[in-house]
Amino acid sequence: MSDITTADVRAELEAWLGENWDPDLTVVEWWERLYDARWSSPAMPVEAGGRGYGRDLASEVSTVLAEANVVGPPTGLGLMLAAPTIAVHGTPEQVDRYIPEILDGTVAWCQLFSEPGAGSDLAGL
């Protein structure tokens, strides 16, 4: 990975967008294409569906997608919290089960909090 430059990423992604972006695609279809090509979360490890890019290269992917004015990849807590945690600490079975549906936008995750004594303590109901 260390030999890849932001210029390389830009050139590859721009070429890929030229061949794959279609404004008539549904968001689901587009996100599937992004996931299949490993552009939906390029900082994720390769074995978890990403490209294993560092911050600079992953940031370049976001920049190129924005400049191309295409629909961006899925976002949210699943992508920011769940997928990275599962990629590092999950079993191979958990990685295979949960990460693809997070990266292709099929499933959205949320984070819930319980505040004992404040009315949201579900265990205390």
How should these model regions be labeled?
Residues 108-125:
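A gly/ser-rich beta-alpha-beta helix-loop segment of oxidoreductase catalytic cores
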Residues 74-93, 119:
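N-terminal glycine-rich flavin-associated loop
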